[in-house]
C-alpha cells in the first residue's frame, strides 16, 4: 500500500514526503484511516509524483488532480513552513511555525524599549546569572543606549522626555508586559525577578544579528555554530530533520550552562588588564561559591581581590618577582589613599590591576594599536604641537599613561548613590574607559593622563562645560554664563568644548539661546556640541575619551619636541592655577569699582588706573582740588587728554568725592 | 521866461496824465516845474522798450521837479534852516537807504538773472551820488548858468539819461516828505547842476571798486562753500566709521558665497527665502570647496583701514545630506576632505553641517533589521569625536530637517556679521554695570541703582547685606573716605570703624558687621600699592612696605 514512487520533479520531493507524513499522522490517530481518506491521500501522492512542473505555491497545488479544498487546507502548513525555512533556515522557526499554523514569532522593533530590555537581559544573564531585578534591568537598558525612549517609569533629571501618552502610569517599562505575554520573559515576585526563556534568548540573538550589534566573541561563536548543522540538514526529509532537532536539544543546555558561569561585564573589565579568561573564570567560580546572588559590582571587587591574591601567593617566575617588588610602594600609597576615604576607590582598584601587570597591559595595548593603526585614515590635519606629559626618551604615550575622564562632583548625576550614577558606571564598562569624580575648579569634565607606574597625573588639553537648556537660560539672565566662559578661557586649555543638552526650541528663550551658541562658537572659539539628553552626553564623553586616547597614544618623545613643546600641567598645579585666577589685586578691585559707574568703558577704566592705581590716590587728588567742583569734575578728562570723556569724568567724581 | 513857456507847452502835449495837472494846481510856480522836466519826453521811449513794470515809475518823474524846489529852498534859507537842513539830510540818507531796497528786489525778481548785477551796481552808484549831492549846495550857490549847461549836456546820451533819471526819482521820493513838512517855496535850479559833474568822476571810480569787491566776495563765498563741504564730508565719514565700529551696518554688508551644489538639494529653496527675508546678500557660484559656504564683507574704501583683517571672514561651512555624509565616512574620505579644506583655508574655522543624519541612520538600521543586507552603520560617532580631538577649529552641527538647516545658516550669517564688531570677554567686561551682584540677593534692585553700593560689593567677600549696612551709615563714598583719610585718627581706630554697624539678618535678627569685614574694607580701600593681592592686603601685607605712621 505504501509503496514509494519516483518523483519526476526533484523539487517536489519535499512535498511528496510531506503528503506521506500527513497520511501517517492520520493513520496513527485512534479513528484510523478510512478507505475514502486513504484513497484521497494515495491520489494526491501520485499526482505530486507525476507532476512535471515544480509546485511552489498553494495555487499550483490546487490545480493538480486529487487536491480539493480539504487537501489544500491540509497542505497549507508545508508552504508556510517552507517559506520560513527558506528565509531564515532555522529549525526552531519550523517548529514554531507548525505549532502556530505558520505565524511568525514576535520580534520587537529596533530601538524600542522591548528590544533594549531583551538584549540587555540576554547580555547580562548569559554568564551564569539567571535573572535581573527590575531597577537593575531598567538602569542597564538605559545605559546601553539601545532604546530611543526612556525605559524607567520615572523621568530622571537630565533626560529628554519624549511623551508617549498623557497617562502617568504609561512608560517604556510597559513593554515588559508584552514580553511576558509573548513568552520571551518570565517573572517571579517578592522581589520581582525577570529571566529570559529559551525562546526569548533566541529572539534576542535574532535581534542582535539583524541589527549588527557588537557582542562578545564567545557568544557570537556559539550562535554561529548552532545554525550550521541545522542549515545543512534542512534540505533533508522531514523525519530526519525532526530527529536531528531532538538530538540537539540536550547539547545546547550544557553549553549555555558552561558559558553562563561568568558575567560578560566582568570579563570585559579584567581582560584588558592581561588576565586570561581561564584565570577570570576560575576566580569568579570561587567567589560565586562563597556568596549568594549579589550585585555584579560586589562580585567584581571580590574577583579583583582573588585575582591579586592568586598572583601574589602562587609561584612566580623571576620577572614576576621583579614586578612584585616594584608594586610594593604603590600598595602602600593605595592604602593611604583608602585611609583618606577617596571617592575614587573603585577606579583606583582598577588601576591597581593595570599597575600590577604593566607588561601584559602594554601588550594588550599594542594589539589595540596595531588594529587601530590599520583602521586609521592616516589623514590627520594637526596644525599645533600638542602638549605632552613627561616621557622618557623614545617612550610612547601609551606605554606610560592611561587616559581618565574626570567628572565634577557637583554634577548631580555623578554623585555616589544616585540612580543615574549607574548610567555612568555602565558607560564606563561599555566604552572600556576609566571615570573618576572629583571637585574641579573650572568646567564640568576634564581628561587627565595618569602614569601607570608613578601614579602621577597630568591634565590634558581638553575641557568640557555641560549645560541643559533651562540652565542655559537662567545662566544667561544672571550673567553666570559669561563669567563661566571667561574662566574656561583663562584656565589655559587649548580645546574648549561647550555641550548644550536638550532642544532649545522647546524653551521660550530659544532665540537668545541660539544666539548665545553662535556667539560662543564664533567669538569665543568654543566647540559647541548639541545632545538630546544626559545619556547622549555621557556617550559623547565616552567617544571623546576614546578619541583623546587615540590622539595621544602614539606620541613619542623626541629631543626636538621636548625642547620646543610645553608640558602638560599636573593636576595639582592646574587646581592651584585656577585658584590663583580667582584672586584679585587692589587695582583689580578698583577697576571693577570704576566699571560700576555709568558711561565708564573698559578703556576709560584702564586709563584711570594708569594715572591713579588705587582709590586712595584718586581720592587724594580730588581732595587737593577741594572747593573747585568744576575742576574736580574735569580733572580726569584734562589729565587724560580727553581719553576719558567729560561725562565719565564727572560720574567718577560723583562716585568717589560727590556729596 | 519865454523859453520856459515854450518848454511847458511841449510837455503838455506829451504827458496827458491827470496827475501833472493836479500838481500844477497845488503849486503856484508851475512854469518853473514844467521847464525842469525837459528830459521827460525822452524817457518814455526807453520805458516802453523795457518791461511794463517801469510804467508805474511815471509818477516818480513828476516828483523830480519837487526835489529841485526843495534844494533851492535850502540854499536860500538862513542859518537856522542850514542846521535843520543838515539834520534832515541825515534823516534823508537813512530814508533813502531804506526806500530803494524794495524797489530793487522787485526789479530783480522781474528782470532776467543776467541783468541783476548791473542793476545792483546802479543802485550803489545812485546812493553814493546822493551823498555827494547833499554836500554841493554849500560850496556852489551862484553858478546858475553852469547848472543849466550841464543839464543840457547830459540829456544827449540815453544811458546817462537813464542813470540820472533813476537818481533823481529816488531823490524826489525823499524830498516829497521834506516838502510836506516845510512848505517853503523857493527856486531849486542851481542845486542839481552842481552835483552832476562830481557824480561822473565818482561813478567811474566806484564802478571799478565795486567790481573788485564783487570778485572778493565771490572768492570768499567759494572758499566758504568749499570749507563747509569739507567739514560736512568729514562729519559724514566720522559718523559712518562710528556706525561701522558699532556694527550697525554689518548685516547689510555681509555677503554669503554659496556653492551651487548646496542649493541644488532640498535646502536651496528654504535657504534662499530665508536670506531674502533678512535682506542678506547672496552670491551663488562654484566655490573652491564643494558644498561649502564662505562669507565676505563689502567694506567701503574710506573705512577699510579700520579692518586690518580684510574683507574675508575666517569661517567655512560644509553642508551635507545624511546619505552623502554616511558614504564619505564609510569610505574614509571625509577626513581627507577636512584636511583638504584646512590646506586651502589654513586659519579658518570649519563647521560640518549635516541634515537628517540621525534619522537617516535609524531608518537604514531599521531596514537592515527587517531585511538583512550589506549595509552597516558607519562609525559616525567615532569620526565626529575625532573632529573634536584631532583637529583645531573643526566643529560639527546636526540638524533634524531642512527648516533647521536654513535657520542655522541664516543665524550663523547674522552672528558672523555682528561678531566682527563685538568685544571679547575680559575680566572687566564680565563684571561691568552691576553684573557682579548675585541673583540671590534680596536687595538686588536697590544695589543696582547705586554705584556706591556696587563699589562696595566689588570688594572681595563683602556680601550685599554688609554693603547695605555700610551704605546706611555712610551714604556716599566721600563720607567714608573723609573719615578714613582723617589724620587725627589712628589706623587701628579706622580699621575697626565699621565693626559695630548693624547688618539685617535673613530671619530678622541683626548681627554686627564684625571686625574682619571692617578691617577688610578699610585696607582694600586705603591701600597704597595696587599690585598686592587682596588676600594679602586683608592680612596686613601693606604694613611691610609702608611705615605705620603714614596715615
UniProtKB/Swiss-Prot annotation, chain A:
Its main location: nucleus. Residues 404-503 form the ERCC4 domain. It comes from the Eukaryota. Belongs to the XPF family. One of its GO terms (cellular component) is condensed nuclear chromosome. Two distinct classes of crossovers have been demonstrated in Arabidopsis. Class I is MSH4 dependent and exhibits crossover interference. Class II is MUS81 dependent and exhibits no interference. Disruption phenotype: Sensitive to the mutagens MMS and MMC. Increased sensitivity to gamma radiation. Deficiency in homologous recombination in somatic cells but only after induction by genotoxic stress. Decreased pollen viability with morphologically aberrant (small and misshaped) grain. Moderate reduction in meiotic crossovers. The double mutant mus81 send1 exhibits severe developmental defects (e.g. The keyword Nucleotide-binding does not apply. Ubiquitous but preferentially expressed in young flowers buds, notably in anthers. Its EC number is 3.1.22.-. SUPFAM superfamilies: Restriction endonuclease-like. This is Crossover junction endonuclease MUS81. It is found in: Nucleus; Nucleus, Nucleolus. Induction: By DNA-damaging treatments such as MMS, cisplatin and gamma-radiation.
Curated annotation (Swiss-Prot), chain B:
Residues 202-239 have a biased composition (Basic and acidic residues). It comes from the Eukaryota. It is found in: Nucleus. Residues 37-51 have a biased composition (Polar residues). The keyword Nucleotide-binding does not apply. GO terms for cellular component: Holliday junction resolvase complex; nucleus. Keywords: Calcium, Cell cycle, Cell division, Coiled coil, DNA damage, DNA recombination, DNA repair, Endonuclease, Hydrolase, Magnesium, Meiosis, Metal-binding, Mitosis, Nuclease, Nucleus. GO terms for molecular function: DNA binding; endonuclease activity; metal ion binding. It holds the Pfam family EME1-MUS81_C. Its EC number is 3.1.22.-. One of its GO terms (biological process) is DNA recombination. It is an enzyme of class 3 (hydrolase). Forms a heterodimer with MUS81. Belongs to the EME1/MMS4 family. Interacts with MUS81 to form a DNA structure-specific endonuclease with substrate preference for branched DNA structures with a 5'-end at the branch nick. Typical substrates include 3'-flap structures, D-loops, replication forks, nicked Holliday junctions and also intact Holliday junctions with a reduced efficiency. May be required in mitosis for the processing of stalled or collapsed replication fork intermediates. Plays a role in DNA repair and in genotoxic stress-induced homologous recombination (HR) in somatic cells. This is Crossover junction endonuclease EME1B.
Amino acid at each position: 500500500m505504501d509503496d514509494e514512487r519516483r518523483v519526476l520533479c526533484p523539487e517536489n520531493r519535499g512535498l511528496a514526503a510531506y503528503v506521506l507524513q500527513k497520511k501517517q499522522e492520520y493513520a496513527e490517530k485512534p479513528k484510523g484511516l478510512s478507505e475514502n481518506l486513504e484513497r484521497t491521500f494515495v491520489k494526491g501522492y501520485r499526482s505530486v509524483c507525476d507532476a512535471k512542473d515544480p509546485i511552489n505555491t498553494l495555487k499550483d497545488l490546487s490545480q493538480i488532480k486529487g487536491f480539493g479544498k480539504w487537501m489544500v487546507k491540509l497542505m497549507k502548513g508545508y508552504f508556510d513552513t517552507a517559506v520560513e525555512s527558506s528565509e531564515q533556515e532555522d529549525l526552531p522557526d519550523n517548529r514554531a511555525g507548525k505549532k502556530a499554523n505558520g505565524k511568525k514569532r514576535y520580534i520587537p522593533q529596533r530601538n524600542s524599549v522591548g528590544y533594549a530590555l531583551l538584549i540587555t537581559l540576554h547580555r547580562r544573564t548569559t554568564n551564569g546569572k539567571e535573572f535581573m531585578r527590575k531597577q537593575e534591568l531598567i538602569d542597564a537598558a538605559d545605559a546601553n543606549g539601545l532604546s530611543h525612549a526612556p525605559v524607567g517609569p520615572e523621568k530622571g533629571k537630565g533626560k529628554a522626555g519624549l511623551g508617549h501618552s498623557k497617562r502617568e502610569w504609561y512608560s517604556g517599562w510597559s513593554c515588559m508586559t508584552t514580553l511576558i505575554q509573548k513568552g520571551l520573559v518570565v517573572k517571579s515576585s517578592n522581589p520581582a525577578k525577570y529571566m529570559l526563556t529559551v525562546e526569548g534568548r533566541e529572539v534576542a540573538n535574532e535581534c542582535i544579528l539583524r541589527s549588527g550589534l557588537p557582542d562578545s566573541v564567545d557568544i557570537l561563536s556559539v550562535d554561529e555554530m548552532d545554525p550550521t548543522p541545522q542549515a545543512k540538514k534542512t534540505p533533508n526529509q522531514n523525519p530526519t530533520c525532526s530527529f536531528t532537532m531532538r538530538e540537539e536539544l540536550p547539547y545546547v543546555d550544557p553549553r549555555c550552562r558552561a558559558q553562563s558561569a561568568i558575567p560578560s561585564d566582568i570579563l570585559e573589565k579584567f581582560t584588558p588588564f592581561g588576565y586570561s579568561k581561564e584565570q577570570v573564570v576560575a576566580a569568579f567560580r570561587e567567589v560565586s561559591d562563597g556568596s549568594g546572588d549579589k550585585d555584579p559590582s560586589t562580585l567584581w571587587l571580590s574577583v579583583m581581590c582573588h585575582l591579586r591574591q592568586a598572583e601574589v601567593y602562587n609561584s612566580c617566575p623571576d620577572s614576576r618577582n621583579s614586578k612584585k617588588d616594584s608594586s610594593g610602594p604603590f600598595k602602600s600609597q593605595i592604602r593611604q589613599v583608602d585611609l583618606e576615604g577617596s571617592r575614587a576607590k573603585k577606579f583606583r582598584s582598577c588601576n591597581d590591576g593595570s599597575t600590577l601587570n604593566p607588561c601584559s597591559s602594554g601588550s594588550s595595548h599594542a594589539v589595540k594599536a596595531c588594529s587601530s593603526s590599520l583602521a586609521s585614515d592616516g589623514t590627520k590635519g594637526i596644525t599645533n604641537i600638542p602638549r605632552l606629559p613627561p616621557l622618557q626618551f623614545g617612550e610612547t604615550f601609551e606605554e606610560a599613561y592611561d587616559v581618565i575622564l574626570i567628572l565634577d562632583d557637583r554634577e548631580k548625576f555623578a554623585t555616589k548613590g544616585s540612580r543615574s550614577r549607574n548610567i555612568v558606571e555602565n558607560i564606563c564598562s561599555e566604552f572600556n574607559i576609566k571615570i573618576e569624580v572629583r571637585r574641579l575648579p573650572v568646567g564640568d569634565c576634564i581628561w587627565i593622563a595618569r602614569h601607570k607606574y608613578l601614579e602621577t597625573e597630568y591634565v590634558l588639553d581638553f575641557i568640557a562645560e555641560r549645560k541643559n537648556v533651562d540652565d542655559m537660560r537662567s545662566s544667561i539672565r544672571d550673567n553666570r554664563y559669561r563669567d563661566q566662559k571667561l574662566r574656561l578661557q583663562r584656565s589655559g586649555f587649548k580645546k574648549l568644548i561647550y555641550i548644550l543638552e536638550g532642544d532649545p526650541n522647546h524653551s521660550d528663550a530659544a532665540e537668545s539661546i541660539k544666539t548665545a551658541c553662535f556667539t560662543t562658537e564664533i567669538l569665543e572659539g568654543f566647540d559647541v556640541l548639541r545632545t538630546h539628553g544626559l545619556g547622549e552626553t555621557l556617550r559623547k564623553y565616552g567617544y571623546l575619551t576614546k578619541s583623546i586616547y587615540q590622539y595621544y597614544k602614539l606620541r613619542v618623545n623626541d629631543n626636538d619636541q621636548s625642547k620646543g613643546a610645553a608640558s602638560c600641567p599636573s593636576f595639582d598645579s592646574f587646581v592651584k592655577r585656577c585658584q590663583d585666577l580667582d584672586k584679585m589685586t587692589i587695582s583689580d578691585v578698583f577697576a571693577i569699582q570704576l566699571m560700576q559707574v555709568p558711561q565708564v568703558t573698559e578703556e576709560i577704566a584702564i586709563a584711570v588706573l594708569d594715572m591713579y592705581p588705587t582709590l586712595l590716590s584718586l581720592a587724594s587728588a580730588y581732595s587737593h582740588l577741594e572747593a573747585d567742583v568744576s575742576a574736580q569734575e574735569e580733572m580726569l578728562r584734562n589729565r587724560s587728554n580727553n581719553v576719558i570723556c567729560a561725562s565719565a569724568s564727572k560720574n567718577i567724581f560723583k562716585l568717589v568725592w560727590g556729596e | 521866461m519865454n523859453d520856459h513857456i515854450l518848454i511847458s507847452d511841449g510837455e503838455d502835449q506829451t504827458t496827458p496824465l491827470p496827475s501833472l495837472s493836479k500838481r500844477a494846481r497845488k503849486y503856484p510856480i508851475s512854469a518853473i516845474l514844467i521847464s525842469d522836466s525837459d528830459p521827460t519826453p525822452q524817457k518814455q521811449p526807453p520805458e516802453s522798450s523795457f518791461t511794463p513794470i517801469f510804467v508805474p515809475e511815471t509818477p516818480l518823474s513828476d516828483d523830480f521837479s519837487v526835489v529841485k524846489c526843495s534844494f533851492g529852498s535850502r540854499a536860500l534859507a538862513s542859518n537856522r534852516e542850514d542846521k535843520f537842513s543838515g539834520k534832515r539830510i541825515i534823516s534823508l540818507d537813512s530814508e533813502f537807504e531804506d526806500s530803494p531796497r524794495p524797489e530793487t528786489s522787485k526789479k530783480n525778481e522781474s528782470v532776467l538773472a543776467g541783468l541783476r548785477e548791473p542793476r545792483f551796481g546802479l543802485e550803489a552808484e545812485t546812493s553814493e551820488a546822493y551823498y555827494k549831492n547833499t554836500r554841493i549846495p554849500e560850496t556852489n550857490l551862484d553858478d546858475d548858468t553852469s547848472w543849466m549847461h550841464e543839464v543840457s549836456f547830459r540829456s544827449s546820451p540815453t544811458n546817462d539819461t537813464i542813470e540820472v533819471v533813476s537818481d533823481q526819482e529816488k531823490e524826489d521820493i525823499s524830498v516829497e516828505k521834506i516838502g510836506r513838512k516845510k512848505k517853503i517855496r523857493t527856486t531849486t535850479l542851481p542845486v542839481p547842476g552842481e552835483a552832476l559833474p562830481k557824480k561822473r568822476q565818482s561813478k567811474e571810480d566806484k564802478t571799478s571798486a565795486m567790481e573788485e569787491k564783487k570778485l572778493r566776495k565771490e572768492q570768499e563765498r567759494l572758499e566758504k562753500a568749499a570749507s563747509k563741504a569739507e567739514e560736512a564730508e568729514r562729519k559724514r565719514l566720522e559718523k559712518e566709521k562710528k556706525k561701522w565700529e558699532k556694527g550697525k551696518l554689518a548685516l547689510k554688508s555681509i555677503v554669503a558665497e554659496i556653492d551651487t551644489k548646496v542649493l541644488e538639494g532640498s535646502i536651496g529653496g528654504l535657504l534662499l527665502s530665508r536670506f531674502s527675508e533678512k535682506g542678506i546678500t547672496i552670491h551663488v557660484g562654484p566655490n573652491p570647496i564643494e558644498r561649502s559656504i564662505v562669507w565676505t564683507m563689502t567694506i567701503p574704501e574710506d573705512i577699510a583701514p579700520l579692518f586690518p583683517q580684510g574683507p574675508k571672514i575666517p569661517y567655512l561651512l560644509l553642508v551635507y545630506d545624511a546619505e552623502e555624509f554616511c558614504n564619505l565616512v564609510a569610505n574614509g574620505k571625509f577626513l581627507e576632505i577636512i584636511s583638504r579644506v584646512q590646506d586651502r583655508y589654513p586659519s579658518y574655522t570649519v563647521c560640518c553641517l549635516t541634515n537628517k543624519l540621525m534619522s537617516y541612520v535609524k531608518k537604514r538600521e531599521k531596514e537592515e533589521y527587517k531585511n538583512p543586507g550589506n549595509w552597516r552603520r558607519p562609525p559616525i560617532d567615532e569620526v565626529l569625536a575625532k573632529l573634536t580631538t584631532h583637529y583645531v577649529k573643526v566643529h560639527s552641527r546636526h540638524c533634524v530637517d531642512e527648516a533647521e538647516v536654513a535657520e542655522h545658516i541664516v543665524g550663523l550669517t547674522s552672528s558672523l556679521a555682528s561678531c566682527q564688531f563685538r568685544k571679547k570677554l575680559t575680566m572687566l567686561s564680565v563684571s561691568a554695570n552691576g553684573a557682579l551682584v548675585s541673583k540671590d540677593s534680596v536687595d538686588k534692585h536697590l544695589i543696582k541703582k547705586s554705584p556706591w553700593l556696587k563699589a562696595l560689593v566689588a570688594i572681595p567677600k563683602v556680601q550685599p547685606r554688609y554693603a547695605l549696612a555700610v551704605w546706611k551709615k555712610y551714604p556716599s563714598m566721600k563720607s567714608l573716605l573723609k573719615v578714613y583719610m582723617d589724620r587725627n585718627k589712628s589706623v587701628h581706630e579706622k580699621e575697626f570703624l565699621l565693626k559695630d554697624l548693624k547688618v539685617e539678618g535673613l530671619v530678622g535678627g541683626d548681627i554686627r558687621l564684625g571686625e574682619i569685614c571692617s578691617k577688610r574694607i578699610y585696607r582694600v580701600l586705603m591701600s597704597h600699592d595696587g599690585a598686592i593681592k587682596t588676600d594679602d592686603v586683608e592680612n596686613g601685607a601693606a604694613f611691610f612696605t609702608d611705615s605705620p605712621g603714614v596715615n
